[in-house]
Swiss-Prot record:
This is 3-ketoacyl-CoA thiolase. SUPFAM superfamilies: Thiolase-like. GO terms for molecular function: acetyl-CoA C-acyltransferase activity. One of its GO terms (cellular component) is cytosol. It comes from Aliivibrio fischeri (strain ATCC 700601 / ES114) (Vibrio fischeri). Belongs to the thiolase-like superfamily. Thiolase family. The active site is at 105 (acyl-thioester intermediate), 398 (proton acceptor), 428 (proton acceptor). Pathway: Lipid metabolism; fatty acid beta-oxidation. It is found in: Cytoplasm. One of its GO terms (biological process) is fatty acid beta-oxidation. Heterotetramer of two alpha chains (FadJ) and two beta chains (FadI).
Amino acid sequence: MSNSVNSSKYQPLTTRQGDRIAVVSGIRTPFAKQSTAFSTTPAVDLGKLAVKALMDKTDIDPKLIDQVVFGQVVQMPEAPNIAREIVLGTGMNIGTDAYSVTRACATSFQTTANVVESIMAGTIDIGIAGGADSSSVLPIGVSKKLASTLLALSKTKTVYQKLSLLRTLSLKDIAPVPPAVAEYSTGISMGQTAEQMAKSHGITREEQDALAHRSHTLAAKAWKDGLIQDEVMTAFPEPYTAWLDHDNNIRHDSDLASYAKLRPAFDHKYGSVTAANSTPLTDGGAALLLMSEKRAKELGYEPLGYIRSFAFSAIDVHHDMLMGPSYATPMALDKAGISLSDLTLIDMHEAFAAQTLSNVKMFASNKFAKEYLGRDKAIGEIDMEKFNVLGGSIAYGHPFAATGARMIIQTLRELKRRGGGLGLNTACAAGGLGAAMVLEVE
């Protein structure tokens, strides 16, 4: 255990018998930009694709799966419990427990943590965690006025009563209402927050564009070098006329100069956040198979790695709302009994280049550590040679509930390629939430 961490906060994640919690395997769908390859595929079907592929990949007996914890951020009213629908749609035992959770962009970190805790408690032996989201198949709502009028219409008896109610509606009342993109409590959008963070922390347009270019360049190289293919299934979405086996947002010919041509997306006059230095709306799903180290050995599996620790944070939503990684990471490191310098890899969710670079700054800020974290000093400066080495969400895309699982799979596989070590996954999330998870590979 590193001398620079608080040993009193060390919390090993093991079962009562002392077994670590293993990630046996993981797989995901390709990530597709909104309204492209998965334009008619709802989140529940993306989740089914990923989980069925995971079951096929591991050849696990479906009867051995005790629980599925799955998440989705953009809810489908017709299938609110996506986890149970996945159980029913993938050939699992009908008695398999399943429940759904949502923690915005950190959702599949939460589903993973929930399965880990259930295994630790001994309430289950084997679980599947993950998440899926569609930004193409959206729950389009109606105005409050139209909703109340439709309800009243259902109770009328005469044509005259119906016509009288319909006359009260304006064109504005009958216009469709898309899902909200702003915080319910403040009305501030993620993009507006990214702009605020860029201005508050001195993140320039050039720095943001450079990070986006780096993300695409590294992701393109990872695909070209064959590092990603084995964790991505080939998907045949309805109507089964085409297939997809790669992420279609990555710029394989990324040119830094081209990023400067885009106009700011949120602050049109003074802004620096653009569509190119932000992660795009994306469709996709991802899933992980977890069990105790002992159970994995009994079944003949060689784990990808282990969950060493996790932590979640919550901060104010009015200012620096996407600074969650800077709050959650110190807690996760303490619980793992390590320091930042002990890490082999660091993978931070790139919601926006501005948010990512702001967090990178705060990791190294003693002032931030003292004023906001109550710590004597910063956790340290990030070694960029360890940071998002295969690219990040700006390149791969961001199906909200699937991103955490994508990061876990990718980091564990890269650690294994490098001969083992410790990895950090961390993400910001709407509502001022943050997540951090330490992974271990021998």
